[in-house]
């Protein structure tokens, strides 16, 4: 896979995302700017420039009309994608670590950091829209605030489950916790990692999700039961993991801590994206290129490409080639042959 290298940031990338159609890539960075790119050729579409500090997180709504960013400058902003203008800005009590639109686009999920005397929390706001579906305002008072549960440390990441039924959070001590999306009521918590959880990404139907942790393990977890379905063990701390549509794979990204990078070669630092089989849990390939840790990996909803954002300030956009789609285990090939024979008998 020959990548398209996107250079639009002066500092490390913090998050990379595709829109629902998979034709645009959204990225944010520690240089206080977010960028938008065409996924097909890597051409730069524009920038979102109004923050005064690190942008930790970015999201885009289902219709690619609005983008949402949150950062270290104690605020989150809503942008018109077509114009690149920030139409709403809301101040927060502490830096914003993660932002996300709810699946139906009616609410915002905001994760606040545990600094400045704030214990860390997840805040949910409702959006006020007009009859044309345009966002008129963000409700002044949040719908509810989920403070860090007593038996856990601060929340690093959070995301909505299917239909916005649950909010799933990943904690600094390796726990995951669930809350009802309607009112923020606590549902359950479970410790599945030994170190902090850096990322949570959902399957296309949002019924299960993958966590990535600094303990070098990624876990596939059922939303309703918190049963750990699969585990993927890497040889380096992980920052991000994503589930691929079309093929039964997961992609993991990470590497040695950024503070140790200057004394380490790229090979020793493990600065590669790793592709694992989702069912059999085997590593089936690696993609090199970054010369620093991978801070985020995201797979296109179309399943035809993935993007990685690195500590080196580059976004590497990979379009999967034929060998990726042709790869099958012997058991998969056998199953397909048997299934074809059964269908022929039925005819």
From Swiss-Prot:
Cellular component per GO, a single term: eukaryotic 48S preinitiation complex
InterPro entries in the record: eIF3i, WD40/YVTN_repeat-like_dom_sf, WD40_repeat_dom_sf, WD40_rpt
Keyword Repeat attributed: yes
Database matches in PROSITE patterns: WD_REPEATS_2, WD_REPEATS_REGION
WD repeats: 8-47, 50-89, 150-190, 192-233, 289-328
Compartments (UniProt record): Cytoplasm
Biological process according to GO: formation of cytoplasmic translation initiation complex
Keyword Nucleotide-binding among UniProt keywords: no
SUPFAM superfamilies named in the record: WD40 repeat-like
UniProt keyword terms in alphabetical order: Cytoplasm, Initiation factor, Protein biosynthesis, Repeat, WD repeat
Top-level taxon of the source organism: Eukaryota
GO MF, one example: RNA binding
One Pfam family hit: EIF3I
PANTHER family, per database record: EUKARYOTIC TRANSLATION INITIATION FACTOR 3 SUBUNIT I
Function: Component of the eukaryotic translation initiation factor 3 (eIF-3) complex, which is involved in protein synthesis of a specialized repertoire of mRNAs and, together with other initiation factors, stimulates binding of mRNA and methionyl-tRNAi to the 40S ribosome. The eIF-3 complex specifically targets and initiates translation of a subset of mRNAs involved in cell proliferation.
Family stated for the protein in its record: Belongs to the eIF-3 subunit I family.
Entries under HAMAP family matching the protein: eIF3i
Subunit structure as annotated in this protein's UniProt entry: Component of the eukaryotic translation initiation factor 3 (eIF-3) complex.
Protein name per the record: Eukaryotic translation initiation factor 3 subunit I
Organism: Kluyveromyces lactis (strain ATCC 8585 / CBS 2359 / DSM 70799 / NBRC 1267 / NRRL Y-1140 / WM37)
């Amino acid at each position: 896979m020959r990548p398209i290298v996107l250079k639009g940031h002066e500092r490390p990338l913090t998050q990379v995302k595709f829109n629902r159609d998979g034709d645009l890539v959204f990225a944010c960075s520690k240089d206080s700017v977010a960028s938008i790119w065409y996924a097909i050729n890597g051409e730069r579409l524009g920038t979102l420039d109004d923050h005064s500090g690190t942008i930790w997180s970015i999201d885009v709504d289902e219709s690619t009309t609005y983008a949402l960013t949150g950062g270290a400058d104690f605020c989150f902003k809503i942008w018109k994608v077509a114009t690149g203008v920030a139409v709403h800005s809301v101040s927060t009590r502490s830096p914003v670590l993660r932002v996300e639109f709810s699946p139906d686009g009616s609410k915002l999920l905001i994760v606040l950091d545990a600094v400045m005397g704030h214990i860390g929390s997840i805040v949910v706001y409702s959006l006020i829209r007009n009859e044309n579906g345009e966002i008129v305002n963000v409700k002044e008072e949040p719908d509810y605030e989920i403070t860090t549960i007593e038996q856990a440390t601060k929340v690093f990441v959070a995301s909505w489950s299917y239909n916005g039924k649950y909010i799933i959070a990943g904690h600094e001590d390796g726990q995951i916790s669930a809350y009802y999306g309607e009112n923020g009521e606590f549902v359950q918590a479970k410790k599945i990692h030994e170190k902090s959880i850096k990322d949570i990404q959902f399957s296309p139907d949002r019924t299960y999700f993958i966590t990535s942790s600094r303990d070098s393990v990624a876990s596939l977890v059922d939303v309703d039961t918190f049963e750990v379905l699969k585990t993927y063990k890497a040889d380096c701390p992980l920052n991000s993991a994503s589930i691929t549509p079309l093929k039964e794979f997961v992609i993991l990204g990470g590497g040695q801590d950024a503070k140790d990078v200057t004394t380490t070669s790229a090979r020793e630092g493990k600065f590669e994206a790793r592709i694992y089989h989702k069912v059999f849990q085997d590593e089936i390939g690696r993609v090199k290129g970054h010369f620093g840790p991978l801070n985020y990996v995201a797979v296109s909803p179309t399943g035809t490409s993935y993007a990685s954002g690195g500590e080196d300030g580059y976004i590497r956009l990979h379009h999967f080639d034929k060998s990726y789609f042709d790869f099958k285990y012997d058991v998969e090939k056998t199953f397909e042959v048997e299934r074809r024979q059964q269908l022929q008998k039925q005819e």
